[in-house]
Structure formats: structure tokens, C-alpha cells
Amino acid sequence: PLDLGTDAFYATRRDAIEARLRQIGEEGAGERILREHDRRFRGVLARGVAWERFSEEALAEGVVRLGGKRLVAVLGPLARDYRSWRRGLPDLLLWRSEGGFGGVGCGGEYWAAGGYEVPGADVWFAEVKSPRDRVGPHQKAWIATLRRAGLWVEVCRVVGEDCVGAEGRADGGEG
């Protein structure tokens, strides 16, 4: 909608938005709603939606792992005030799966691997930072909101040696 990101968006749709959030909060409803909307709208141009980043299966897995109440903790702020909450959501959503963990990243990656686990958490968010990067105000707001909802959130500092990409080494040296 053209008014997404304005005060009018939520004000004119308050009852419908709150009803949908209550519906999503019911156990199992999130996956059903996601699959229905994915089939109906996948590929339709919409502000803030990058269909090519995530498959229906990756989205459904994330929705199931989060569960209704925690999903509402993520969607509620976006629906009520998109302008303020569109930035800062942590980079990764991770969850326990057989043999380790699975997850989705902001670039659309979907994986399952063994190794890293967060004690006592079945699903968690990770904000990834380089050594010189700092957690900004929008990220701090999201971290606090997600933690209040009972979600585990970690800030992960990554340090790499011999980081090689398409342009060569990150330090400017020869790859």
C-alpha cells in the first residue's frame, strides 16, 4: 500500500491488523496463513518484500519454529509502525533441528548444519557484526523487543583471516 510507512497505514487498518495478529498468534495458524499467501501472492511486487530471497519451505520452517506468539512479537512492531521498525531486525533466524541447527539469513540462505547451539533455546536470532561494526539504535530496539517476547538474541562478532571474496582479500592483498 502507498501509505505503508506512514501513520495512516496502521490508523486506518487498526482493527484488521490487530485481528490478524491475534489469528497469527493462535498455534498453527501462522504456517497456514503463510502458505496461503505465498501461493496467492508470490511474485507480486510489494514494498519490503523480496520473494526471491526465501523459498516457501524456508519461510514455513521459520514460522513453525517461532510459533504464533513469538511470530507476533516480530510482525506486530512492523505492522504497527513500519517506518520505525523496518530497520535493525537481526541478520539471522536460527533453530534447533535434528543433528544441529537450521536457519535463514537476510540474503535468503537456508541451511541445516551441526555444531553451534544456544543452551536452552529452540529458536534464536543473531545479529552479526564485524570487529569495527557496532550495534545501532534500531538494532538495540529490536533486540530489546525480541528479548521481552522471550526470544534468545545474540550479537555475534565475526573475525576472519584470509577473507576472500569476488574482489580478492578483504585487506586489499592478493588472494
Per-region residue spans from a language model:
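Nuclease catalytic cores
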Residues: P1-R87, V135
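Conserved catalytic cores of phosphodiester-cleaving nucleases, focusing on short active-site segments
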Residues: E57-V74, L78, D91-L94, G102, ...
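An N-terminal amphipathic alpha-helical segment
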Residues: S84-R96
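Basic, amphipathic alpha-helical patches used to engage nucleic acids or provide basic targeting signals
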Residues: Y110, V118-V158
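Basic, glycine-rich
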Residues: V158-G175
